[in-house]
Amino acid sequence: MNTIQNIQQLREFLTVYNTLSERCFNACARDYTTSTLTKDEGSCVSQCIDKQMLVNRRFMLVFAEQAPKALFKQGEQSPTEAIKSAKPEPAVPAPEATPVETTPVIEENKQ
């Protein structure tokens, strides 16, 4: 890797790290009277980090599986164009739209 790629990779890592730290701190830190975490806070942070890392790993696996399909779905497009035009496929097809006749509601003024 060249230097620019190393810097970009470091920047991405630090962004993920900072986001993870902020989420877990906001979710777990409750006692600001001490300079160390309480036992409950430490446990919460550990569970939070484990959960976030698991979610990140699952997300990356799905991304690694789906990205090539999206990139080369349309063979005539370049990978950049394919990414821009790729739309996520809905899990459930949308129902057919059917016209519905409506009857206007007339409100009576009661005085």
Curated annotation (Swiss-Prot):
Subcellular location: Mitochondrion inner membrane
Disulfide bonds: 24-48, 28-44
A GO CC term attached to the entry: mitochondrion
Taxonomic superkingdom: Eukaryota
InterPro entries linked: Mito_inner_translocase_sub (IPR050673), Tim10-like (IPR004217), Tim10-like_dom_sf (IPR035427)
Membrane topology: Peripheral membrane protein
Region of interest: Disordered: 73-111
Molecular function in Gene Ontology: metal ion binding
Predominant subcellular localization, coarse grouping: mitochondrion
Phenotype on disruption: Worms display a small body size, a reduced number of progeny, partial embryonic lethality and defective formation of the somatic gonad due to defects in import of proteins into mitochondria.
TM region positions: none
Motif (Twin CX3C motif): 24-48
GO biological process, one term: regulation of multicellular organism growth
UniProt keyword annotations, A-Z: Disulfide bond, Membrane, Metal-binding, Mitochondrion, Mitochondrion inner membrane, Protein transport, Translocation, Transport, Zinc
Biased composition (Low complexity): 94-105
Entry similarity comment: Belongs to the small Tim family.
Assembly: Component of the TIM22 complex, whose core is composed of tim-22, associated with peripheral protein tin-9.2/tim-10b and the 70 kDa heterohexamer. In most cases, the 70 kDa complex is composed of TIMM9 and TIMM10.
Its biological purpose: Component of the TIM22 complex, a complex that mediates the import and insertion of multi-pass transmembrane proteins into the mitochondrial inner membrane. The TIM22 complex forms a twin-pore translocase that uses the membrane potential as the external driving force. In the TIM22 complex, it may act as a docking point for the soluble 70 kDa complex that guides the target proteins in transit through the aqueous mitochondrial intermembrane space.
Domain comment in the entry: The twin CX3C motif contains 4 conserved Cys residues that form 2 disulfide bonds in the mitochondrial intermembrane space. However, during the transit of tin-9.2/tim-10b from the cytoplasm into the mitochondrion, the Cys residues probably coordinate zinc, thereby preventing folding and allowing its transfer across the mitochondrial outer membrane.
PANTHER family assigned: MITOCHONDRIAL IMPORT INNER MEMBRANE TRANSLOCASE SUBUNIT TIM9B (PTHR13172)
The name this protein goes by in its record: Mitochondrial import inner membrane translocase subunit Tim10B
Organism encoding this protein: Caenorhabditis elegans
